[in-house]
């Protein structure tokens, strides 16, 4: 692998994304003789498998989020930048994020996935995704508001409709 770093310096690895793949990549390189920068737009890692419990009020958002800096605290070769990646300049080998430039010799793009509406974007207001803490708290708010409205409804059919939920996926 050809490295563009200056003579005598360590290879620069930039990991974009602080989800499972990005964090595991960073941790796997803990003992490597490199300078690693992990960039994410959030300063926390969200444990997505438990987001449904945040949405249903069984857990608080703090129970499924851990500061990325804390996770990588003991890793001497790593630093964390909270920034939103705007572009990758392939010619200069730099990631451009929040008006800063992060030079790299090796780039790992681990930005995760998003939900899809399969050509039906009009479903989005009625079928929110569940990938972020904000998604979970929005779903929680919608559920609690539906119960509040159902409690005030006099018509049993309206009450039934307000307390009927469909989960897809």
What do these predicted ranges mean?
Residues 2-82, 86, 160, 165-166:
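Beta1-alpha1 glycine-rich phosphate/pyrophosphate-binding loop at the start
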Residues 1-12, 78-166:
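FAD-binding core/adjacent interface of flavoenzyme oxidoreductases
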